[in-house]
Swiss-Prot record:
PROSITE patterns: KH_TYPE_2, RIBOSOMAL_S3
Originating species: Sinorhizobium medicae (strain WSM419)
Annotated protein name in UniProt: Small ribosomal subunit protein uS3
Annotated gene: rpsC
Domain of life: Bacteria
NCBIfam families from the UniProt entry: rpsC_bact (TIGR01009)
């Protein structure tokens, strides 16, 4: 079962927490859920160059707080914060509520599964050999502290007539171990031969305490230690 299920959903409430953190009654729930989906789709498309790792949405008391985890926050903020203000206004229109926007820098994109998957997909679109892209990602992740990584690419790899799946793994990736801190990300590469899917699993160690926020807190501490300074964060109200 651990081999097939989404590793993040499998660990929700154990050492991972939700990316949408709000409660609503039955009348509003469907509308707010669709708003979340639209916000994420819009940000992923609009800020594709910024390397979006995760979008966290909170809704405290008729407001909306959106936290964007990005590898290149400068592209979102813009010169003197002009771009982030435009983005905040657009999100306010989409939600019909006051929106607060936070930008958090991901200091180690090489060990973030979503960013690794996006990087490999972009290389496939540029016709980089898939084996070279996968090996380079594996080596970078292991060098920067990952305890294990697994990458799969599926589709008409290299323009082959028949689609197939290729994968690489290095280190340990214990998918059945619930205390394991496993990050998971996917991406799609739109090549001339069709769409190729990329999946990435990264094992970052074990979390022994039973705390849904443990994984997020641990990632922040790791970023601060590895980045040589305090966490870079921009908040715009």
């Amino acid at each position: 079962m651990g081999q097939k299920i989404n590793p993040i959903g499998f660990r929700l409430g154990i050492n991972r927490t939700w990316d949408s953190r709000w409660f609503a009654d039955n009348a509003e729930y469907g509308q707010l859920l669709h708003e979340d989906l639209k916000i994420r789709a819009y940000l992923m498309e609009e800020l594709k160059a910024a390397g979006i790792a995760k979008v966290v949405i909170e809704r405290p008391h008729k407001k909306c707080r959106v936290t964007i985890h990005s590898a290149r926050p400068g592209l979102i903020i813009g010169k003197k914060g002009a771009d982030i203000e435009k983005l905040r206004k657009k999100l306010s229109e989409m939600t019909n509520s006051e929106t607060h926007l936070n930008i958090v820098e991901v200091r180690k994109p090489e060990v973030d599964a979503t960013l690794v998957a996006q990087s490999i997909a972009q290389q496939l679109e540029r016709r980089v050999a898939f084996r070279r892209a996968m090996k380079r990602a594996v080596q970078s992740a292991m060098r920067l502290g990952a305890e294990g990584i697994k990458i799969t690419c599926a589709g008409r790899l290299g323009g082959a007539e028949i689609a197939r799946t290729e994968w690489y793994r290095e280190g340990r990736v214990p998918l059945h171990t619930l205390r394991a801190d496993i990050d998971y990300g996917t991406a799609e590469a739109e090549t001339a031969f069709g769409i190729c899917g990329v999946k990435v699993w990264i094992f970052k160690g074990e979390i022994l305490e039973h705390d849904p926020m443990a994984s997020e807190r641990r990632a922040t501490e790791s970023d601060n230690q590895g980045g040589g300074g305090r966490e870079r964060r921009r908040e715009n109200a």
